[in-house]
Amino acid sequence: FLIGTSSDKTDFPYVMPGPDDTWGGTWRTSGWRTHDTNILFNISQKPKNGQCKLIIDLVDSNPNRSVVKVTINSIEKKFEIKGHSEEALEGNVQNAKEQILEFPFSTADLKEGGNIVTISVLEGGWIVFDQILLEGSDRVTLGDNNKYAFLRNVAPAAYETELEGKRVQPLLIDVEHLNGTPQLTVKLDGTDIFAAKLDTSRSIFEAPMPAVKKNRKSMYQVLVNNELIEKGIVLRSPQALQTLADYVDTKIGTAHSRWMIAPGPWMPFSMVKLSPDN
């Protein structure tokens, strides 16, 4: 959900299932399913010091138990709540018990550019939303959204790779596609270092910056269809060389081999069967 672009009537769920809810995907053959709701917003300016508060007002929650985790950029807080009425799940709020989750934080935890709030139900059952508020200083100003893409984050990678026989340190461009097939361009100190057509959903691109032998500051610019959407200073530094094994991430499905891989003890090679690593 992107503030200023998405519609709460069509793009935000009124209810979020927990892992105890089979209608949310949990089952003995499909495993334990948790769900996340992401709220993206762009900040054009903010004070260095100040306090904010995120308020999540719930109509009700599962009468047994729900553990809700709220993440704001890199900080998080967990809430364990217990609701009252099962009927709230189907829209009958006569016996509902309101739950208000408050998350105070500093403006230092926000950043100019892309920010994200993630709401997750880690344990227990469903929650039903009423409203979500972010209170803070009037000097925190929302920025305008680009029509085609939302830039989540720009950061130097903590590794180097090889490109055409030369070492490079990637500049990680975390971008969310919104509309059309826009051209993404990245400049470093005024020179184009990366270009790609955006397609669907979220992508993290590696824009290759020439490797350095000592720390060095450079200016980066990110453009979409030749429109500047972010610029800033990046600190380049020497890093270790990344291997293919370092890209393994169990959170996105990379894990151990399944039992059906063959040939193997359960199906010797003499039986002439080759199976994919499923």
Language-model features: where?
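Beta-strand-rich ligand-recognition modules
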Residues: 1, 5-7, 15-49, 57-142, ...
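Contiguous beta-strand segments within globular domains
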Residues: 31-41, 45-55, 155-174
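Accessory carbohydrate-recognition regions in carbohydrate-active enzymes
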Residues: 166-170, 177-181, 204-222, 232-278
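Short, exposed coil/turn segments at beta-strand boundaries within extracellular/luminal domains
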Residues: 125-126, 225-230
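Short proline/glycine-enriched turn/loop motifs at strand-loop junctions of beta-rich domains
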Residues: 61-64, 176-182
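Short, compositionally biased P/S/T/A/G/V-rich stretches that sit at domain boundaries
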Residues: 132-164
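Short, aromatic- and glycine-rich surface loops/edge beta-strands on solvent-exposed regions
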Residues: 115-120, 184, 216-226
